[in-house]
């Protein structure tokens, strides 16, 4: 049996130049596996703790405490363990080495979700190496998934909200090539729409409007959210993919939810007179008008993470036609997913491994969601690294959808390129989710 010989963590940098954690797991057969953790800009209040150092170095964002926790606490405790035993190792780290709990479960407040996750991801890669199988297959075996499917990519091509320095309140405007017949073709469609969008924006708003945001999407200085949708519609038409490429949105509404329970669509304006504040009901009606006019198939975080009332209304009224995705609402937390399955505020899970902090808990959240008939979208964070784990995760769990930015910026393309390699490796066994992106496989 191959076992863990040592674990080494270090501080590296994410795509925004902020520190993050990377971990190497060395095995006693001389091989090693490496994983790095991403971090988000618009974070949900219910996410597991991302441990930062505070103080003045790195604007308080150093991760030397988390690195130390891996090197001095987690690492030594894992020596001699079998890396193929993912669930046992994750549970040992989360429940015994850390052991902190809040009302939503294991909150990782002692060691940090970033410390635990770096090791959890590296263990998963090491387990695949030991079994001499691809990472996506190892993940499928851990989860008990028999049918692997390549996801539909959701390219975030217009950035607003906390990801961009423009006035746009809503955070992401995405394109999904559901009409492609393979992942390779989906990439072609996405890339061509992206380049058409660039020329449309340049012509309408000038050269500097094609500067890109954190996730590689364009950030033109428009204020009307509808204008973002109109730009996408035009670019899709110009590329010749009307009907084959559809639209998704991530509103990240918690970012502009106010204490009086209104939503401020002008929250980024310095001299804000409050004239753009609207009620949850009015915001719901705005979404419904968008859905009536544009080929929208997915809306993520349409309301604040605690505004379950409007979430539920939206899902009841539009849930058949459009998937309502919970991100800040669910934070990939099995307990919150269970509550949502019981109360119906949404009908899809956004899967972000660093919100919960371990591979095992992420798989649990996905399996629960699939059993409830929900869609699942695997996701990057806005502060990313070159690590491609989520590409394999999306195939291994047959999520059916993945969002990892625009077809621009290497830390985003790293994931998409890995999916191209996986599709090639699977050969004639490769299945692309396409129009079945919400339910690509039977629950496992």
From Swiss-Prot:
Signal peptide: none
Gene3D superfamilies given in the database record: Enolase-like C-terminal domain, Enolase-like, N-terminal domain
Binding site for substrate: 163, 172, 300, 327, 379-382, 403
Pfam families: Enolase_C, Enolase_N
Location(s), subcellular: Cytoplasm
GO annotations of cellular component type: phosphopyruvate hydratase complex
Keyword terms, alphabetized: Cytoplasm, Glycolysis, Lyase, Magnesium, Metal-binding
Cofactor note: Mg(2+) is required for catalysis and for stabilizing the dimer.
Catalytic-site annotation from UniProt: 215 (proton donor), 352 (proton acceptor)
Name by which UniProt lists this protein: Enolase
Organism: Mesembryanthemum crystallinum
Organism placement in taxonomy: Eukaryota, Viridiplantae, Streptophyta, Embryophyta, Tracheophyta
